[in-house]
């Protein structure tokens, strides 16, 4: 959810997020490729290897989105391109999973749909080594983010190096999204819905308020959805993305309708 908030700040778009912009899907494809290659050769994948692969995939997708953003003026077209990237990466991931050995297909399929069931304390420690410094860096950028939200011209007027700041936002958002995807697979709508729910709850859009709220709110939201996914139809376990979509998609619909009605009144 923190990655989603950073992307919403960077693109100035309320529905930007790792899943919608295709970043999570790019990370998923890279991790799936590494896992299939390693597993088919009887090798073990370390946490660092998965994080590195996910980050490379996330940055590749992000690079494509940024290239498209320079050619289009309408943000809606950029979002559609991001969604298409996600579909392409997901389709290629399915082809990759098809080449996995039979004993590994179930685990790979569950991971590719989004699941916390394969997480271990070793994974948590490895992710924490990356996520905590990234979040600390994001907190340090709170004041520049507040200025950037007022517009690039205003940010430059107060002495912010917009180009370097934008690169940091891209790097941090991709890194945070990659860490989650490396171990839990792509989890939809958390990065979009939670930042807006936090803003509504606290009645503030200040980064110093929203960022910690996203961290705590995203964790609570995912825990609740994971509990529902595991217990609602036990012993059958749903993918966590299917549950987050049930709660997150209405928030996105509300955002689109609210934004359209606001433009209509203007």
Feature names for model-found ranges:
Residues 1-266:
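Alpha-helical transmembrane segments in inner-membrane proteins
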């Amino acid at each position: 959810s923190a990655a989603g908030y950073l992307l919403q700040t960077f693109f100035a778009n309320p529905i930007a997020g790792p899943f919608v912009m295709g970043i999570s899907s790019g990370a998923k494809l890279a991790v799936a490729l590494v896992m299939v290659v390693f597993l088919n050769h009887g090798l073990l994948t370390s946490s660092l290897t998965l994080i590195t692969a996910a980050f490379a995939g996330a940055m590749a997708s992000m690079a494509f989105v940024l290239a498209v953003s320079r050619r289009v003026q309408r943000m809606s077209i950029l979002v559609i391109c991001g969604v298409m990237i996600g579909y392409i990466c997901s389709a290629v991931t399915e082809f990759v999973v098809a080449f996995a050995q039979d004993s590994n297909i179930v685990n790979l399929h569950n991971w590719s749909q989004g699941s916390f069931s394969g997480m271990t304390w070793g994974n948590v420690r490895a992710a924490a080594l990356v996520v905590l410094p990234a979040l600390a860096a994001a907190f340090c950028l709170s004041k520049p983010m507040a200025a950037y939200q007022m517009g690039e011209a205003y940010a430059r007027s107060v002495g912010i190096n917009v180009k370097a700041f934008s690169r940091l936002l891209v790097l941090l958002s991709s890194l945070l999204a990659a860490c989650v995807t490396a171990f839990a697979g792509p989890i939809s709508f958390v990065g979009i819905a939670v930042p807006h729910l936090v803003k509504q709850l606290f009645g503030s859009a200040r980064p110093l308020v929203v960022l910690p709220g996203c961290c705590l709110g995203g964790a609570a939201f995912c825990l609740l959805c994971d509990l529902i996914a595991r217990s609602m139809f036990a012993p059958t376990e749903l993918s966590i993305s299917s549950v987050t979509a049930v709660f997150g998609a209405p928030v996105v619909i509300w955002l689109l309708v609210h934004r359209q009605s606001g433009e209509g009144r203007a």
